[in-house]
Amino acid sequence: FGDQPAATEILVERVGPGQADPLPLPAYPTGEWLAEDIGGKGVLDRAQSTLVLGKDGAVTGSGGCNRLMAKVQFERSGIAITDLAATRRLCEEPLNKQEMRFFKALTAARQWQLDDATGKLTLLDNDDRVLVVLSRK
C-alpha cells in the first residue's frame, strides 16, 4: 500500500510432545540419617548422632545425648539448617564434645551431596570442606 514497507508476519509453533517440562529438582535428602563421621574425627561407637530432615522443613534428631530441633531449607544442592535448639541433659565429656561438633557442623552446612552408589549424605561448608557424612538409618 503506497510507500509503506510490507508487514512481516512471524509464526512460532512449538515442536515436540507435550508442554515444556520444568528443570527437574533434585530429590532432597529427607528422611532419617545417622552420622558416620563428624569433622573427619569419626564418631563414638556407643553414641548415635541422628538427623531427621522433614519435607515440611522441620529437623529433629539427637546429638547422641540431647534431642535437637531446627529448620531446614533446600535449594538445589544448597542447604541451610537454622534455629537449632537442643535439650540440656548433662552428658559425659567425650559425648558432649562430639555433640557440640555435630551441632556446629549442622549449622555451618551450606551444601549437600548424595552419593548414589553408597547412599551416603555429605554436608559441606561454603569452602567445600566436609562437615558430616551420614548414612540412611
Model-derived segments and spans:
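Lipid interaction determinants
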Residues: 1-137
